[in-house]
């Protein structure tokens, strides 16, 4: 390898942006075909290609950062800024859903019966499954912080236990949310209430699944001795993302489940 006189990582040519873009094209085309022709083949093909791209790309980044030493302090600083900007973009993504909800609920139109929830909608009790989900996510926020402290103190066993517990709580939250959707007395087609409810909570649920996957990768890396008390940005990014998911849920719970009911 040629000597470089700077601390920055000059990335090698990679096929993964191309395969990722192809997967995105297949998924959007597949979604349209599923809606109009009831065929899932193209959508599944796109999802499979996306999954393979993610696995291969993450594998390359882990190799570069863990085994090849390319993630120097300036590179880590750039990755931190990148993750912060990504989370900020996600905040604005959810802001659109909250805007739609409050736009519809603060001044209900005559078509909705002039009230919120709209006439004919039987909302979910905020003090049953939604409250349990809130407790589960808050507990997972505590366990992921516990894992971070264990990692920083070099307590490998404690970090593994806390991370495992966090993933279990994430999976439990997803299972409770799926049960709630299955038993909900309204659907996504039931006017603006059903649409805002299922789109906002559904996208949050998708983020919980992504966050749980992110943490599962971190758990595997921790088991394989990839992290040290000084060098563990992959875990830090996962923890930031998980805390963001927690905070979004609190706003969803207070707005849609509690105030909106």
From Swiss-Prot:
SUPFAM superfamilies: Cytochrome c oxidase subunit III-like. InterPro entries: Cyt_c/ubiquinol_Oxase_su3 (IPR024791), Cyt_c_oxase_su3_dom (IPR033945), Cyt_c_oxidase-like_su3 (IPR000298), Cyt_c_oxidase_su3-like_sf (IPR035973), Cyt_c_oxidase_su3_a-hlx (IPR013833). Keywords: Membrane, Mitochondrion, Mitochondrion inner membrane, Translocase, Transmembrane, Transmembrane helix. The keyword Translocase applies. Residues 35-40, 106-128, 184-190, 257-261 are mitochondrial intermembrane. It is found in: Mitochondrion inner membrane. Its EC number is 7.1.1.9. It catalyses: 4 Fe(II)-[cytochrome c] + O2 + 8 H(+)(in) = 4 Fe(III)-[cytochrome c] + 2 H2O + 4 H(+)(out). The chain crosses the membrane at residues 16-34, 41-66, 73-105, 129-152, 156-183, 191-223, 233-256. Component of the cytochrome c oxidase (complex IV, CIV), a multisubunit enzyme composed of 14 subunits. The complex is composed of a catalytic core of 3 subunits MT-CO1, MT-CO2 and MT-CO3, encoded in the mitochondrial DNA, and 11 supernumerary subunits COX4I, COX5A, COX5B, COX6A, COX6B, COX6C, COX7A, COX7B, COX7C, COX8 and NDUFA4, which are encoded in the nuclear genome. Component of the cytochrome c oxidase, the last enzyme in the mitochondrial electron transport chain which drives oxidative phosphorylation. The respiratory chain contains 3 multisubunit complexes succinate dehydrogenase (complex II, CII), ubiquinol-cytochrome c oxidoreductase (cytochrome b-c1 complex, complex III, CIII) and cytochrome c oxidase (complex IV, CIV), that cooperate to transfer electrons derived from NADH and succinate to molecular oxygen, creating an electrochemical gradient over the inner membrane that drives transmembrane transport and the ATP synthase. This is Cytochrome c oxidase subunit 3.
